[in-house]
Amino acid sequence: MARISGVDLPRDKRVEVALTYIYGIGRSSAKQLLEQVNVNPETRVRDLTEEEISRLRDLIDKEYKVEGDLRREVSLNIKRLIEIGSYRGLRHRRGLPVWGQRTRTNARTRKGPKKTVGVRRKK
């Protein structure tokens, strides 16, 4: 099993797909990576040589911000937005959608499960 940036890549998947298990590497950056190190994207992870794995590992370490470093940067960016009191920071703080989606009916992913509000009737 190939281990790159602290992530065990699944042996039975194609390299192009397996690289996306690393936080910060998607399909397009995986394709670029494989092109740079001259590895066929159709190759299975179990068929990679040690040399190919080390070339991939070196390139990712040198040129890509992945896993812990990227997660830290994202959380610091969100913290900064909250501290400066921007609109985006306010939305993050309240747990609402940040990019302008409607919230009257949808936005359940950000808001969490429905909280039923009781109705008060006159006596």
From Swiss-Prot:
Located at the top of the head of the 30S subunit, it contacts several helices of the 16S rRNA. In the 70S ribosome it contacts the 23S rRNA (bridge B1a) and protein L5 of the 50S subunit (bridge B1b), connecting the 2 subunits; these bridges are implicated in subunit movement. Contacts the tRNAs in the A and P-sites. Residues 103-123 are annotated as: Disordered. Belongs to the universal ribosomal protein uS13 family. This is Small ribosomal subunit protein uS13. Pfam families: Ribosomal_S13. One of its GO terms (molecular function) is rRNA binding. The gene is rpsM. Residues 105-123 have a biased composition (Basic residues). The keyword Ribonucleoprotein applies. The keyword rRNA-binding applies.
